[in-house]
Amino acid sequence: MPCSEDAAAVSASKRARAEDGASLRFVRLSEHATAPTRGSARAAGYDLFSAYDYTISPMEKAIVKTDIQIAVPSGCYGRVAPRSGLAVKHFIDVGAGVIDEDYRGNVGVVLFNFGKEKFEVKKGDRIAQLICERISYPDLEEVQTLDDTERGSGGFGSTGKN
């Protein structure tokens, strides 16, 4: 049976969402909130927007409020990740970027200014991206020893220079 033009036009991301029933739900907490958006159909994350103006001095940090609440799909958490343009152009990074499945507060983004100049955040600026990732909730088991591996306890550059 041939595909209709409408069915063929459905994006891969919409098909994937329809198949797993996943939905990232959100609530605007104020008139200052901007709905999360994706920059393209295949973008991994949803852009998060500042609800207010902030000034972040060099080598300082700020919790930038979005004035949105979110509910990530069941079995997921939200990872708040940096936007590459802010990192490259302004030395802005994101910290403490985990939103648990059961968190329902105002989403705040910790922005670090590693630059030498103050950084101005304006209301409506894209400040970070929210990526929904699957998570496992394993039971915690204390044991006497762990199995040996080829790598062993080597870390911090032990597997090679590059």
Swiss-Prot record:
Classification via InterPro entries: dUTPase, dUTPase-like, dUTPase-like_sf, dUTPase_trimeric
Subcellular location: Nucleus
GO molecular function (one): magnesium ion binding
Biological process (GO), any one: dTMP biosynthetic process
PTM info: Phosphorylated in vivo on Ser-11, a reaction that can be catalyzed in vitro by CDC2.
Residues binding dUTP: 83-85, 97-103, 108, 151, 156-157
Residues annotated with Phosphoserine modification: 11
Pathway(s) served: Pyrimidine metabolism; dUMP biosynthesis; dUMP from dCTP (dUTP route): step 2/2
Origin: domain of life: Eukaryota
Record EC number: 3.6.1.23
Cofactor(s) the protein needs: Mg(2+)
Cellular compartments per GO CC: mitochondrion; nucleoplasm; nucleus
This protein's UniProt keywords: Hydrolase, Magnesium, Metal-binding, Nucleotide metabolism, Nucleus, Phosphoprotein, Transit peptide
Subunit: Homotrimer.
Family: Belongs to the dUTPase family.
Biological role stated in the UniProt entry: Catalyzes the cleavage of 2'-deoxyuridine 5'-triphosphate (dUTP) into 2'-deoxyuridine 5'-monophosphate (dUMP) and inorganic pyrophosphate and through its action efficiently prevents uracil misincorporation into DNA and at the same time provides dUMP, the substrate for de novo thymidylate biosynthesis. Inhibits peroxisome proliferator-activated receptor (PPAR) activity by binding of its N-terminal to PPAR, preventing the latter's dimerization with retinoid X receptor. Essential for embryonic development.
Protein name per UniProt: Deoxyuridine 5'-triphosphate nucleotidohydrolase
Organism: Mus musculus
Lineage, highest ranks first: Eukaryota, Metazoa, Chordata, Craniata, Vertebrata
